[in-house]
Swiss-Prot record:
Amino-acid positions noted as binding carbamoyl phosphate in the UniProt annotation, renumbered to this chain: 55-56, 105, 133, 136, 261-262
Keyword Cell inner membrane found: no
Functional summary from the UniProt entry: Catalyzes the condensation of carbamoyl phosphate and aspartate to form carbamoyl aspartate and inorganic phosphate, the committed step in the de novo pyrimidine nucleotide biosynthesis pathway.
GO biological process annotation, one example: 'de novo' UMP biosynthetic process
Pathway the protein takes part in: Pyrimidine metabolism; UMP biosynthesis via de novo pathway; (S)-dihydroorotate from bicarbonate: step 2/3
Family membership noted in the UniProt record: Belongs to the aspartate/ornithine carbamoyltransferase superfamily. ATCase family.
PANTHER family assigned to the protein according to its UniProt record, in alphabetical order: ASPARTATE CARBAMOYLTRANSFERASE, ORNITHINE CARBAMOYLTRANSFERASE, MITOCHONDRIAL
Annotated protein name in UniProt: Aspartate carbamoyltransferase catalytic subunit
Cysteines paired by S-S bonds: none
E.C. numbers: 2.1.3.2
Organism: Chlorobium phaeobacteroides (strain DSM 266 / SMG 266 / 2430)
Lineage of origin: Bacteria, Pseudomonadati, Chlorobiota, Chlorobiia, Chlorobiales
Keywords, in A-Z order: Pyrimidine biosynthesis, Transferase
Superkingdom: Bacteria
GO CC annotation, single: cytosol
Length: 308
């Protein structure tokens, strides 16, 4: 395994291998003074982020340092990209500095796959346009696996702007591979065409999705959708598709809740649902557990691509 640009064609055994290795790292991370073998001591990893990021960038940096690697932090606004340098030239110049891998966040779909044709080094997709975000999906699956033991037969629905979501796409591919039952819940204007061809259930009624599901992955609503003709208003979206305590209490169904962040509080999810880590109540938020698990999962990815 040389690159991780998506989960669309990643076989079951590779996903399971990454999740199993992440579990080993997570066990050590839980100790008071976690210590890891510096398996990547001589490696240099370029964190090339052409879009803003908090959780993904910092967790990759922490993951690399736990394994002994050094990181080069790249931001487009403070680089020669702002002077017109092409993506290809940027990658070639970083490779000339003898980096061993690229972690790429880019606004264009397919950018990570494009870069694999430019460099001989390993490429990890940290989110490209509306294409894929494989490490986010891996940490989501890892988090659910911690709670349920397996994703086989698990009912999981993804709520929100599916059409523009790279997180949704990677989760659909990965969870179907692991045997989960996947559903989408969204206004019809924010559903991509052809999803029903994958054997995915579609809900346009949030109450019905909650009654069906064991867990929900809530997506950040990109606020510009309200002015782009996709939604009547943010308020209308919150009424019909916002995950709230009141809705869960009315249905009386306990739900595990995930969200990739950042959160639009009181739009796609209420603060009470987002912040409740455990009962009482009809939901348990796994949001911060996802962030913690992101380190272990990204350690597993770096170890698999660079140390084996």
């Amino acid at each position: 395994m040389k690159h991780l640009t998506g989960l669309c064609e990643l076989p079951l055994y590779e996903i399971q291998r990454l999740l199993d290795l992440a579990a080993v790292f997570k066990k050590e991370l839980r100790t008071k003074a976690p210590a890891f073998a510096p398996t990547l001591l001589s490696k240099k990893i370029a964190l090339a982020f052409f879009e803003n990021s908090t959780r993904t960038r910092f967790s990759f940096e922490i993951a690399a340092k736990h394994l002994g690697a050094s990181t080069l932090n790249f931001t487009a606004s403070s680089s020669s990209v702002s002077k017109g340098e092409t993506l290809g030239d940027t990658i070639k110049n970083l490779e000339a500095m003898q980096v061993d891998a690229f972690v790429i966040r880019h606004p264009s779909s397919g950018a990570a796959d494009l870069i694999t044709g430019i460099t001989s080094k390993s490429v990890i997709n940290a989110g490209d346009g509306s294409h894929e975000h494989p490490t986010q999906a891996l940490l989501d699956m890892f988090t659910l696996k911690e709670h349920f033991g397996s994703l086989e037969g698990l009912n999981v629905f993804i709520l929100g702007d599916i059409l523009h979501s790279r997180v949704a796409r990677s989760n659909i591919f990965g969870m179907l591979t692991l045997g989960a039952n996947v559903a989408l819940c969204s206004p019809s204007t924010l559903l991509p065409p052809g999803t029903s061809d994958l054997g995915i259930r579609i809900f346009t009624d949030l109450d019905q999705a909650i009654q069906w599901a064991d867990a929900a992955i809530v997506l950040r609503l990109q606020l510009e959708r309200a002015t782009g003709g996709y939604l009547p208003s943010l308020g209308e979206y919150a009424v019909h598709f916002g995950l709230t305590d009141e809705r869960l209490e009315r249905i009386r169904k306990h739900l595990l809740v995930l969200h990739p962040g950042p959160i639009n509080r009181e739009i796609e999810i209420s603060s009470r649902v987002a912040d409740r880590m455990q009962p009482p109540g009809f939901s348990s938020s796994l949001l911060l557990q996802q962030v913690t698990n992101g380190i272990a999962v990204r350690m597993a990815v770096l170890q698999t691509l660079l140390a084996e």
